[in-house]
Amino acid sequence: MQTPSENTNAKSDSLDEPGAYLIEENVALPKDIFHSYLSYWIYEAAHCTPVMLLSLVIGVLISIIILFHDNENCVGVSVGFLLIFSGILVIVLILRFGPQISDEDFKCKLLMEIITRKPTVKGKEWRTITYKMNQYLFDNDLWNTPYYFYRDEDCHRYFLSLIKGRTFKKQKESSASNVKDAQSNDETAGTPNEAAESSSFSAGPNFIKLLTKAAEIEQQFQKEYWRQEYPGVDEFF
């Protein structure tokens, strides 16, 4: 029998669902579960219904070409359809795996995790955040599997894409009050008339406040990371 730690290090090439041995103390990400990125990608594609249907059609067309290779008309028609369905498959793959998750609640939850856990650059906190965000996407039907982010660096890069190119004003409030205000608009909205005059209604956290606070945390740890790597470069920050 394998111990939990042995299970965590186990690798799998099959398309079967990997074992449920993800634990909070030593989370396993897709990079740890799958033998290679190719096997991970095949697993993800296999859980996309349009991809599977198109792959089945392409497989049938290839079989027809092989079986009836002496029939020029049959081969010609099959090759034509093969090219068409192959092109459609490429488009579906691009549309499925190309765009980033744009769900607002997902972004807010990610920012909440960053504000709460305060992950350092390349810190182990990113593994936990990545695992929790993968699970959130799966539980809320935003992704077909609990393995959206292949590794913690991918989740970190996704966060950086949210703040890249943005200009933030430094918040004067304390960290605790910032998070509290972002989590509860009811406490700061005042009366309905006051709310109508000062701000628009929001059913969830204040995204801009969350983004600003998370960006401040990232900037702080980026400075600390580079100062440790290259002492004496404070003038560049």
UniProtKB/Swiss-Prot annotation:
Organismal lineage: Eukaryota, Fungi, Dikarya, Ascomycota, Saccharomycotina
Subunit note: Interacts with PRM9. Binds to SEC23/24 of COPII coated vesicles.
Protein source organism: Saccharomyces cerevisiae (strain ATCC 204508 / S288c)
Highest taxon listed in the record's lineage: Eukaryota
Region (Disordered): 174-201
Family: Belongs to the DUP/COS family.
Main location: membrane
Region annotation COPII binding: where it falls in the sequence: 236-237
Protein's GO biological process: vesicle-mediated transport
Protein name per Swiss-Prot or TrEMBL: Pheromone-regulated membrane protein 8
Membrane-spanning ranges: 48-68, 75-95
Miscellaneous section: Present with 1254 molecules/cell in log phase SD medium. Members of the DUP240 multigene family are specific to S.cerevisiae sensu strictu. Cells lacking all 10 DUP240 proteins show no obvious alterations in mating, sporulation and cell growth.
Sorted UniProt keywords: Endoplasmic reticulum, ER-Golgi transport, Membrane, Transmembrane, Transmembrane helix, Transport
